[in-house]
């Protein structure tokens, strides 16, 4: 709205902020806290005097009611409109163009027309209703990140937990989670109003961020948001890299860029999808789902969308460098994004260097797995000349996970040598 575009925000709960407020996750974990997020943080805490008894102790902590009210007031003061108690339940499309959103309201169903629609449901609900392809638990794997349904006592703003698995697109499963929570939290004042989920439906966008993109610090010419976190997986992992070599401990922080094309549902125009609904592999999502980063992403998408309306262009046709210059100016993005180039893939010499080092506890595997075919060729050649049993086991494990089953006997023999289970990995 501040950029001159007519803006309507729809929210089915009674306050803004989602999991950061009514979801009782009012404390930051990791994440990049510069840019627009720094403005939010400072403004929310300035809603009361510094000596107010409810002022949080420590950084990155925000009372839920303060943050909800700041969002509401900021939106209305800028001239935007806000409808509470309204849920998006469909999309109006014409060919590949999204023209509006179907809504369920206390007064019945209706349609709101849009030039640009921002799907910040967190599970790509509107984009998927419009026909966007998506990925989620159940199609290829049963892996899902742990979730919770926390208590809510007067004055609370942080009750983070991880004790259940829930499909928040299934109303029966969500109902089951709340029934279960009422039993688990019997005697508490109240419960959160939305399931505290960490994994949801993700669009198939113009590009899909991979684990390798994050670990290899891939850069893009169309970066729209900057992220910092660890592979805090809260559950099973499925990427071949992590099956062979589990993620490093929680304290290992990665920085990752998210390009605009990961917010654009493939084959659709006039819509962007933010947050946990973005186009990324599920194992990469923990690094790009931190609240501070997504607040900056929300600002960036809002700014870009307003520009699209003013210039009568689609998000794919907008001058991304113009958007980036503004985001760099306010601190959302590092200045390097203005000159970042498209990644062309690793060279043959880089791949050969990686295969030479991979027998040292899988060092360089994140490079090799970016190109499975070349990896198979190099590993097959390497294992043929390997003499050390430990090297053969590592190379055989790589080949087997890429479908080269003839090397399975090497792994079977190695497994037989173990008398006990290892300590495993506590992934919650």
Regions found by a protein language model. Give the residues of each.
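Solvent-exposed, acidic/flexible segments
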Residues: 13, 60-64, 68, 287, ...
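Structural detector for internal amphipathic alpha-helices that build alpha-solenoid repeat scaffolds
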Residues: 360-373, 381-385, 390-404, 423-428
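Conserved N-terminal/central alpha/beta ligand/cofactor-binding core
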Residues: 5-6, 10-90, 94, 135, ...
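Amphipathic heptad-repeat coiled-coil/leucine-zipper-like oligomerization helices
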Residues: 77, 106, 341-376, 390-391
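Flavin (FAD/FMN)-binding glycine-rich loop and adjacent Rossmann-like elements that form
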Residues: 40-44, 68, 85, 89, ...
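Alpha-helix C-terminal capping segments
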Residues: 1-5, 129
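Buried hydrophobic core positions in alpha-solenoid tandem helical repeats
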Residues: 351-356, 378-382, 410-415
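Short, hydrophobic/aromatic-rich segments at coil-to-beta transitions
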Residues: 95-101
